């Protein structure tokens, strides 16, 4: 247990060091006499608690906001990078996010069947949004690819698929354009 606590303490110290130049967090730290990491963790906990309790039905908008902000930022950053290493992660995320948005048309029925749906959705979206967890890669490999591969290039043999992929990758390297 002490390993776990020391790991969290170390990460919080790293957070405080990394954001020591942030003016807003510095002002909050000066006013409250609490480290930046405690403030951010407390605000994150309060945010998740509001989603969990779903007072006045705000859980839906807070969940969607949390599920949009970080992936949107990462997507904008990915558009500026020449490599396509992060594209599968982000595209998988947006596929799952869109699928959940379509399902939520029946949100009253979902909330009846799954009482803490917005909280569970938020935790799940954060899990697949963070590249460190590998959640989107796992979802892609276990669910998305097996369901969609049979419809994409379904009339093409494996050899032809490999040739197509190789020529696309070759063209990508020659032109410097990224392949998605």
From Swiss-Prot:
Annotated membrane-spanning segments are 36-55, 58-78, 89-105, 109-127
Any phenotype upon disruption? Cells have more than three vacuoles with a grape-like assembly.
Superkingdom of origin organism: Eukaryota
Q: Name one GO biological process term.
A: endoplasmic reticulum organization
* Membrane-protein topology: Multi-pass membrane protein
Please list the residue ranges that the record places on the Cytoplasmic side of the membrane.
2-35, 79-88, 128-180
Chain's gene name: YOP1
What does the entry note on its domains? The short lumenal loops between transmembrane domains 1 and 2 and between transmembrane domains 3 and 4 may impart a wedge-like configuration, thus deforming membranes.
What the protein does comes down to: Required to generate and maintain the structure of the tubular endoplasmic reticulum network and the vacuole. Induces high curvature in membranes and causes membrane tubule formation. Involved in membrane/vesicle trafficking.
Q: Which UniProt keywords apply?
A: Acetylation, Endoplasmic reticulum, Golgi apparatus, Membrane, Transmembrane, Transmembrane helix
- Organism the protein comes from: Saccharomyces cerevisiae (strain ATCC 204508 / S288c) (Baker's yeast)
> What family is this?
Belongs to the DP1 family.
Task: Please state where this protein is localized.
Answer: Endoplasmic reticulum membrane; Golgi apparatus membrane
Q: How does it assemble?
A: Oligomer. Interacts with YIP1.
What protein name is recorded for this chain? Protein YOP1
Q: PTM N-acetylserine: at which residues? A: 2
Q: Name one GO cellular component term.
A: cellular bud tip
Which lineage? Eukaryota, Fungi, Dikarya, Ascomycota, Saccharomycotina
User: Pfam families from the xrefs?
Assistant: TB2_DP1_HVA22
Q: Which residues lie on this side of the membrane: Lumenal?
A: 56-57, 106-108
* Keyword Cell membrane listed: no
Interaction with YIP1: where is this region? 2-17
Q: Which InterPro entries match?
A: TB2_DP1_HVA22 (IPR004345)
User: What residue stretch is flagged as signal peptide?
Assistant: none
UniProt miscellaneous comment: Present with 1759 molecules/cell in log phase SD medium.
Coarsely, its chief localization is endoplasmic reticulum
């Amino acid at each position: 247990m002490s390993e776990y606590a020391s790991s969290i303490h170390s990460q919080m110290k790293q957070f405080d060091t990394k954001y020591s130049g942030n003016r807003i967090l510095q002002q909050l730290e000066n006013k409250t006499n609490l480290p930046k990491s405690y403030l951010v963790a407390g605000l994150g906990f309060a945010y998740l608690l509001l989603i969990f309790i779903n007072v006045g039905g705000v859980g839906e908008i807070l969940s969607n906001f949390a599920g949009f902000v970080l992936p949107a930022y990462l997507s904008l950053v990915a558009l500026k990078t020449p490599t396509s290493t992060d594209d599968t992660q982000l595209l998988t995320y947006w596929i799952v996010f869109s699928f959940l948005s379509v399902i939520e048309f029946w949100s009253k029925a979902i909330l009846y069947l799954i009482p803490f749906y917005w909280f569970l959705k938020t935790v799940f979206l954060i899990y697949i949004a963070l590249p460190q967890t590998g959640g989107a890669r796992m979802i892609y490999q276990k669910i998305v690819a097996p369901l969609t591969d049979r419809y994409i290039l379904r009339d093409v043999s494996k050899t032809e698929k490999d040739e197509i992929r190789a020529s696309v990758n070759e063209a990508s390297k020659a032109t410097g354009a990224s392949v998605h």
